[in-house]
């Protein structure tokens, strides 16, 4: 009986030692894997839905994501509510706020693509864009002016406060007033192909009013036209 107990004890002791040794080997392998991956590694292929690139302190600098998991943007350090955005890349500045990006989407009925550069604390001021809804299509380079008096954070807070009042008329009137003052941004220049199939250079003044159009229309006719501040055509001087 004593011999059997001694044998059982030795077996139990062996299992304990084996378990400890196996745990140590697994822990060592896990540590080596962790250490290797955190000090550079090479991968032939990786499949993910989203990648966040951050600084050492955790500040977000770049997001690469599919449409479903795309970042909604950060303004004044606050993440915006989730919204529909195309797959692609979103850029963030040294302070962690969104400062541009490259997004795209497309199917048979509609497609769009845009590479945007944002003014500091404001919306886009330069964009290379393409939009197609199956019937109308335009693409080219567009530029805007943005007001320092109405940065994106301030505009978002104003919009949210008005929306909370449940007064759509007041919201619409306020936005119209801001646009009239040029506080929501004004398009200044477009170089490309328009919805009506004209290709050329189109310039607006600081109120967003069309002033100069130079290009070729859909019938291959020359466009060389100026406009006054209320939209009346004026003659441009030309040596053509």
Please annotate each region the language model reported:
Residues 30-82, 86-240:
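Parallel beta-helix/beta-solenoid repeats that form elongated, surface-exposed shafts/blades used
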Residues 1-37:
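Single-pass membrane-anchoring alpha-helices
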